Amino acid sequence: MSSKKRISVHGLEDFKDVSGKWVKSFIVTTPIEYIQNYTRAGGLWDNIQNRCRPNRACQERWKTYKGVLNSFSDFQEFAGWCQSQYGYFEREDNGRFWSLDKDLRTDKRVYSPESCMFIPNEVNTVFINCKKFNDLPLGVYFDSNSGKFKAQIRGTAKRNLGLFWSDVDAHKAWQQAKVVQIQNLLAKYNEHLLMQEALHLKLDILQRDIAQNAITNVL
């Protein structure tokens, strides 16, 4: 007799069991299938747990998860916290839920009620690669074809800002474009108070560096 097909279903509506506790997952079996169902909060919790366990695939594969900690006391606290958060029930145009984010606020190493929020992918992509990983300033790449420095900004898509003889001039173009990006996000998501606070901090960093003619090393 052949074994049952195993299926995982994610993103189901959160609910409590008869004892009043939030349900993380439940199993449904049919004659041919073994279905592991995860509530939305349950799936997010499993992702957090996997990212925070030392020596697990996430920490080995992605350096950004090295040393990341989970300070939620347990799943019940996390699931209850989710219900009260702005954006938890919001969806993208493609139907996907907004993402749980720990990086937009100050502490990028801890999943906690103080550091996490739910944000749209549009905001998340604006801050991809906003940390120095090489000798060039943020937003700057050397274009071997022209022998110049290319300024490039990321959002929902990459956008080239031009070619410059100086890496500093290319970085200045990136700074100015990033300011406009953040200002547009502030105007678009003006009801998300936590995100507004975090975006204003990013904007302050950029505007301070521009005023002081300084390089922005991390955003």
Predicted feature locations:
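Short, cationic Gly/His-enriched loop motifs
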Residues: R61-K148, Q152
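A short, exposed loop/beta-hairpin motif centered on an aromatic-Gly-Thr core
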Residues: K66-N70, A157-V168
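Short helix-coil boundary/hinge micro-motifs
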Residues: S2-N50, Q59-F72, Q76-A79
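Class I S-adenosyl-L-methionine
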Residues: I48, A173-Q176, V180, A187-K188
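An aromatic-rich alpha-helical recognition segment common to small helix-rich domains
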Residues: F78, V140, A151, F164-K178
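Short aromatic-glycine-(Arg/Gly/Cys) micro-motifs in beta-strand/loop hairpins
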Residues: G43-Q59, V140-R159
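Extended, polar beta-sheet/loop recognition surfaces of beta-rich domains
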Residues: I182-L219
